């Protein structure tokens, strides 16, 4: 599966964007209220009360991706923390250039890349579990990978998908 590295999208109707590993087409609509994005099975609707610039559409979509990752990431943390018997700190979501996630083992805070909303949810699950496992084993030691194998046996497939970028 090919994922775009560059942001050369123009946000015209019919243009394809990735959401949770699926290609969906953009539709631009005018509507009352605040600017928003609505995801259907086939479309990513950008709804605005008036015409907005390309930069504004990029920011709107970037914020929407971050919110999606925040929601699903929090659900995954709530699901996995008891399984791993860890107590994570706060979840931070932001666009990152060189990492998919990080864990501060002192504060137990987890930081996740908002771009993960473009990949299948299994990739986000892999990153969440990876960062939570760091609360048990801070380094990428043999023990760390043994814990990953124990809790998420298919983690290598997700890692390969993310490493291909």
Feature map (PLM): residue ranges:
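Active-site-proximal or metal-binding-adjacent scaffold patches in catalytic folds
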Residues: 1-126, 135-165
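Walker B catalytic acidic pair
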Residues: 131
């Amino acid at each position: 599966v090919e994922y775009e590295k560059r942001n050369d999208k123009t946000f015209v109707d019919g243009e394809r964007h990735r959401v949770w590993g699926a290609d969906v087409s953009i539709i631009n609509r005018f509507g009352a209220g605040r600017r928003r994005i609505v995801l259907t099975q086939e479309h990513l609707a950008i709804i605005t009360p008036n015409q907005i610039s390309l930069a504004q559409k990029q920011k709107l979509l970037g914020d929407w991706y971050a919110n999606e990752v925040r929601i699903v990431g929090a659900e995954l943390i709530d699901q996995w923390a008891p399984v791993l018997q860890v107590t994570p700190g706060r979840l931070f979501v932001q666009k990152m250039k060189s990492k998919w996630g990080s864990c501060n083992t002192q504060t137990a805070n987890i930081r996740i890349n908002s771009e993960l909303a473009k990949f299948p949810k299994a990739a986000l699950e892999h990153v969440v579990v990876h960062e939570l496992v760091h609360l048990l084993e801070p380094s990428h030691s043999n023990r760390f990978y043994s814990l990953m194998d124990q809790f998420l046996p298919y983690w290598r497939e997700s890692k390969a998908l993310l490493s291909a970028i």
